[in-house]
Swiss-Prot record:
It is found in: Cell membrane. Residues 122-151 form a propeptide. Pfam families: QVR. Residues 1-19 form the signal peptide. The lineage of its organism: Eukaryota, Metazoa, Ecdysozoa, Arthropoda, Hexapoda. Required for chitin fiber assembly and organization involved in cuticle formation and tracheal development. This is UPAR/Ly6 domain-containing protein rtv. Keywords: Cell membrane, Disulfide bond, Glycoprotein, GPI-anchor, Lipoprotein, Membrane, Signal, Transmembrane, Transmembrane helix. Disruption phenotype: Larval lethal as larvae are unable to hatch. Larvae are hyperactive and occasionally change orientation in the egg case. Tissues that produce a chitin cuticle, such as the skull and the trachea, fail to form properly. Disorganization of chitin fibers in the cuticle and in the trachea. Elongated and convoluted tracheal dorsal trunk with tracheal lumen expansion defects in stage 14 to 16 embryos, possibly due to uncoordinated apical cell surface expansion. Detachment of the cuticle from the underlying epidermis allowing it to expand giving a bloated phenotype. Disulfide bonds join C26-C65, C29-C38, C60-C88, C100-C113, C115-C120.
């Protein structure tokens, strides 16, 4: 019985990862200074954005999301000209690795981050799916091992 429960939990978690792979959306918004809801910290989730003007969760064919920070030399938070834009990008880096780096975008020097995952461009740190799977699996594995040791 315990093994069946563990097996069902594993199948459920694998299906969650598969679902994440099928649907890729990105946040789309832009803020400048204190104007707009796109600035950091970005506190919205997939359901919140439906109520927030100027912020949307859009389907992204490439699966790659981006975040661009423009202005302020060192990108200081208190800079009036600091602009943050979140978007779907047509294609990610050539090596398919999530990353952030200084680059040129629309003829301006910016700090740009690329990530691949559903709504990944809203988070400060990229995808948390592997950590969530590990956190969920450890108690299940521990329970299963204890059951095996008792029998």
């Amino acid at each position: 019985m315990q093994f069946t429960s563990l097996l069902l939990a594993v199948i459920f978690l694998i299906s969650l990862v598969s679902i994440d792979g099928l649907l890729r959306r990105c946040y789309q918004c832009r803020s400048r200074g204190e104007l707009g809801s796109c600035k950091d910290p970005f506190t919205f989730n997939a359901t919140d954005v439906e109520q927030e003007p100027g912020v949307a969760a859009i389907p992204c064919a490439s699966g790659w999301c981006g975040k661009v920070i423009e202005g302020g030399g060192t990108y200081a938070i208190d800079d009036y000209d600091l602009a943050i834009q979140r978007m779907c990008v047509q294609r990610g880096p050539d090596d398919n690795m999530d990353r952030c780096a200084d680059t040129i975008y629309n003829y301006k020097k910016v700090y740009m981050c690329f990530c691949q995952g559903d709504l990944c461009n809203g988070a400060r740190s990229w995808s948390s799916a592997p950590q969530m799977i590990l956190i969920t699996m450890l108690p299940l594995l521990g329970s299963w091992l204890l059951q095996r040791m008792r029998n």
